[in-house]
Amino acid sequence: MFSLTQILTFLLVAITLMTFSSAQPIDEERPIFMERREASAFGDIIGELKGKGLGGRMRFGKRSSSPDISLAEMRAIYGGDQSNIFNFK
């Protein structure tokens, strides 16, 4: 059969070949994206409050509480009648 030295040599060569054949640059092929979480139990709530307080956008596509144009500016542009604000002709 095979001696212990031959078996160990074969295993060493096989492991070495498998190691070098499967090695690929991790940072170039598959970047690691880690989900950022707060450490506390209220991490999601704290994150939402931080985002709103610093003027960040809200999640899930909702608009922020301060629109780009105020109602007073819209009245000045389109007149005092509110019925034609969104009636573009």
Curated annotation (Swiss-Prot):
This is FMRFamide-like neuropeptides 27. GO terms for biological process: neuropeptide signaling pathway. GO terms for cellular component: extracellular region. Residues 24-35, 64-89 form a propeptide. The lineage of its organism: Eukaryota, Metazoa, Ecdysozoa, Nematoda, Chromadorea. The keyword Secreted applies. It comes from Caenorhabditis elegans. It is found in: Secreted. Residues 1-23 form the signal peptide. The gene is flp-27.
